[in-house]
Design a protein with these regions (language model features):
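Short, hydrophobic/aliphatic alpha-helical segments
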Residues: 1-13, 55-68, 155-162, 218-235, ...
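Active-site environment of divalent metal-dependent phosphoester hydrolases
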Residues: 32, 80, 219, 233-236, ...
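Conserved phosphate-donor
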Residues: 46-61, 196-235, 264-289, 299-307
Length: 335
């Protein structure tokens, strides 16, 4: 019976059982998409990364699966994969090129094991200030009342900040609906309606809703975020790399900071799930005329570079038994 090594890796943390757990299958060549989906369901992590040999000059190829579907990109599973490969001496520190469903991404592994993932140039589509109707094709307007009801947050907490920070769809490869909230007490008490969030996600063609506040638990943090993605099988994601990069691009696009944009941002997330983690985000201008220009730029620059970074630690290392050809039973985990 065929076996495959399978890891559970906690990303955006240096401690086991914190951050965001990802499944990682470090040698996934030969697996079919159906087998990858079944393995992801068996491991039960919000996303599982399947590491394949690179194509067309790239170093690696990764496919990402939730327990229910394939997704084009997953930040925390990417960080988890490279941190695990580096810890096993399967990759060296330095720069690598990763192929994903959204294109080729630049990865940097630092000598201390920190992994940086450069994402696609961000695209930001501002929908409104939280109280007026949006331009989507939804039957019900996407205003503060509807968003507040879906998130289980007092709509006043959205209106209070919406005049300065609009609701928007932001993407660096995987789109998210970005919803600012005034204070952490409101974000922390969120009681989301999964069906309502799924409906909004489908209408806006996004993976989920990322709600954030500048009111943080730690003084060093830029913001506190929560990510809800029932449309892709994840009611709440503890720490979300793709959303963090997208929100970094959003913050620059809407001029969220007075003066110079910070050199590096620190996003805290997962505390209300007892899985605290921290995403480092770098957002910078690419010189005029560079490839990949995006409509994110509201500052006269032609393109924006976004990278997310963090650490990760292996919390489980085991073997997955695959059923023989023609056997419909699911595999089981052997520690």
């Amino acid at each position: 019976m065929e076996t495959r090594r399978a890891l559970l890796v906690d990303a955006f943390t240096d401690e086991p059982l914190a951050g965001n757990v990802a499944g990682v299958v470090p040698a996934a060549d030969g697996l079919t998409g159906e087998e990858m989906g079944r393995i992801a369901a068996e491991l039960g992590a919000s996303e599982t990364a399947f590491v394949l040999d690179g194509e067309d000059g790239t170093d690696e190829r990764i496919r990402y699966f939730t327990p229910t579907t394939e997704v084009d990109l997953c930040g925390h599973a990417t960080i988890a994969s490279y941190a695990a490969l580096f810890a096993e001496n399967e990759v060296d520190s330095g720069d690598r090129t990763l192929r994903t469903n959204v294109g080729d991404l630049a990865i940097t592994v630092e000598s201390d094991g920190t992994v940086w993932m450069r994402q696609n140039p961000p695209a930001v589509d501002v929908l409104g200030g939280g109280d007026e109707d949006d331009d989507t094709d939804s039957a019900a307007p996407l205003n503060a009342d509807r968003l507040g009801d879906a998130l289980g947050i007092d709509p006043a907490a959205l209106r209070d900040i919406g005049a300065d920070l609009p609701v928007a769809v932001a993407s660096t490869g995987l789109p998210w609906l970005v919803v600012p909230v005034n204070f952490l007490q409101h974000l922390g008490r969120a009681d989301p309606d999964a069906a309502a969030i799924e409906a909004i996600s489908e209408e806006c063609d996004v993976a989920g809703v990322y709600a954030f506040t500048f009111d943080t638990l730690e003084a060093d943090s830029t913001l506190h975020g929560r990510a809800f993605a029932p449309a892709v099988g994840v009611d709440e994601d503890p720490v979300t790399g793709t959303a963090s990069g997208a929100v970094g691009g959003y913050l620059r696009a809407v001029d969220a900071f007075d003066g110079e944009f910070p050199e590096e941002l620190r996003f805290e997330q997962g505390h209300f799930l007892d899985r605290p983690g921290y995403v480092r985000v770098r957002v910078g201008a690419v010189s005029s005329g560079s490839d990949g220009a995006s409509d994110v730029d509201l500052r006269g620059e032609s393109a924006i570079s976004v990278a997310i970074g963090g650490e990760a630690v292996v919390s489980m290392d085991g073997a997955l038994r695959l059923p023989a050809d023609g056997d419909d039973e699911r595999g089981i985990i052997e520690a």
